[in-house]
């Protein structure tokens, strides 16, 4: 019962021992054979090999091989007959294997330490405690079968790595150890690897190892040489020096070995004498080069002909610095073509008129003609005459050389400061005043800077709060005529507003939150003072049959209740109202009134006067001098300055404009600006000249209003029909020798153009750098 399992177990152990012994003995015999072969190649001398017969060597070798095989078989039998050998038995077997090494007679055995160095393996213990031979990796040399490429580390053979996808390793090395799969990074590491490319990087992966396949330094050098068109092998010389294995020179032994004499290395004196003799003969002409007879005869004939250079002794003259080249003829035009366009050909009437005109009075000396081809064009009959006249012009007409100056146009322009350095000035719209129906024709800010008055085409006058845009008061002056102008009385002792509608000028005291009862009563007293003066019989009498220059009256109960206290009626429609700086006089302009177009009104006396019997042109606008008793009247083309005390003409200013639209004077009284309908803004220095000091064109359409800042700020502005306002920085220096500084700083856009009309009027705040504008779009705007 128990014998069967024991036998089975014994049989299994025998098989395991057989396999282990076979592996160990096979390795041992293989190593011994290699050592024997190396010993034979290294230590057998050649003289002994010659003495030994080849046949005996073969027989001896075969006998030795048979003996070794018998011994190995005996050892195998011994191993098969027992169980796994012990350590003593393994030592005995290894000793027997050492005794079985093949040695040749007459050959000295190697020393033991040299044999250990020459061995290509190591002896280690296996799992059972036995010896195990671990061979070194083969390093191929130049004489090996594969010396170019190193043997693969992975020894799995030609097997796809996909078979190892489910294993942590990818194969085995030559020693049977597992080659673990290389670690792979995440996407960020892959991106960094592609950015920081190492030296020799190819972007490929080794199929056998899974590692990146990089090029070695030798491979990189090989690639570089191929790219540069060089020979791949650095040591290869494609153009070696020629080795003459055979020569045509016959080298014979000299008869004498004496050294060469010095005369062999020095030039011959006899030859030098012969050469100098030939040189002297060539210089003297006794030796001539060979020439054909024909050429020699031709030279002799040329020598017989004597030629003289008449300009031989003439010295070159310097070029005349006064020479002026003749002007060039103008290039021909289309009318001189033999086939001109139809519009250049004259009609029958033009031809007859040209023929009847005298040749001296003709604009052209010829009439354009048309020919179908150039060959049909006849000769020009007056060619000789034209050439003669051209020569006469060049001969008789004097020429003048004009020196042109190469001047940069930008250097002639004045250096203007930057607009950012000239602040403050208005830049943006702050408040929009809406309420009028139609065009807002006039606008004005009161002397305190709180209230704003506007007059429009709807015949109404409206008063607004300047900062909030709230309408405070409104009155309708006329249902037929528009309100052309509104102007505040310039003094602060009364709150009086003047407005014109048709032939009437209305004086009113509008209610406002800033007006105190005392100020309101003072304003009413100023307007009512003139009625007492007229009642006392002080009103000047007019000639019989003529209307008075102005009628002062009360407007009626309805308007008086609204705040309109006085109405002044003149002979024609009033378009302009201008106050004197003291507030007791104001002037009106009626362009259609002819002689009575300009009138001066006295508020304290309710008196109207016509200062001019005759005006040279239609009056457009007037303005009082801010400091002197001077009165400026602008007609269509000129501005006349009158002295009201002396009643005389002081100056005539000629702006050069075709039609003057507006006028204003600087607070200093020495400078004047004029706006015109021909799109020009003109600055006049009254002390300098009657002509404009500077002309500015910044608008594509007409300029309707110009205004200086009265509060001391160096600002002025103009309003145009293109819907824009142009703000200028205008500084007047105290020194009269200096010119004023005029810089355009800002263009304000906001108003819409209605029926070719844009911005109609403009006014400045008395203290702040703010301005207000009235436009044809029915709005008024406050710019800050």
Curated annotation (Swiss-Prot):
Family: Belongs to the WD repeat BOP1/ERB1 family.
Molecular function in Gene Ontology: ribonucleoprotein complex binding
Subcellular location: Nucleus, Nucleolus; Nucleus, Nucleoplasm
Presence of keyword Nucleus: yes
Record field: transmembrane: none
SMART domains named in the record: BOP1NT (SM01035), WD40 (SM00320)
PANTHER family: RIBOSOME BIOGENESIS PROTEIN BOP1 (PTHR17605:SF0), RIBOSOME BIOGENESIS PROTEIN BOP1 BLOCK OF PROLIFERATION 1 PROTEIN (PTHR17605)
Residue numbers spanned by region Disordered: 1-125
Identification of the protein by name: Ribosome biogenesis protein ERB1
Keyword tRNA-binding recorded: no
